[in-house]
């Protein structure tokens, strides 16, 4: 599972709104689209260890780089709304038709928004570690994490990261550090420097705070039960911002939701909880 380079499929590209978007895929069958997060260096490569196993399970497993991430073109003006809207446009350009979404981190909010807006396009939704889809933190929980995260975000936008910075970032988000190979670090660092770093800096200045653009009258976590397609949610108990406790609260509040909370798992759910994702995700998608 650590020999990432040997698992890497060929880079492919499609054109969306005049931008060249890079994607990787494996297998054939019903489409499953993996959506990466928003931190510096995020790209389709974070799913390299997941595509092959899902392909072997009978799916066309696909992951793409959002505009401004990885090897995709960088738009003149970036926004979270543009990233979200690139998802259905990529689906059309890549010929995925009706597809399941496996969304990590901030992309979970995108997936839920899109599935609520046009349920006919999406067969299933799997959410991995999306904190914005949990009940908010209590006053007692808010504090140290936010201060540390704000400092890290500022530092990441000030100086181009080193290879060691890339390793530390992965270690901070992964419970089992033995999963992090030199190849993982090299791939992450590649997507953190050069034009990607400049794009990250630009996003800090251009992005609106809400993933959907306008403020929402009802938080997305309160709308999860409105989804028309099957929904599976997986969180790491040791994830940031008390995610484990908040996931327990959501599970107790809405026992009808399929929520799995994995011990020994931080934010990189698809790495730390690889076996859990396969064990729960494959039969869920086959249902």
Q: Where do the protein language model's features map onto the residues?
A:
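Acidic catalytic loop of the alpha/beta-hydrolase fold
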Residues: 237-242
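Short alpha-helix in the alpha/beta-hydrolase fold that links the catalytic acid
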Residues: 47, 184, 220, 229, ...
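Conserved alpha/beta-hydrolase catalytic His-Asp/Glu region
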Residues: 142, 159-225
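Conserved HGGG/HGGXW glycine-rich cap/lid loop of the alpha/beta-hydrolase fold
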Residues: 15-71
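Short beta-strand/loop motif that positions the catalytic acidic residue
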Residues: 227, 233-235
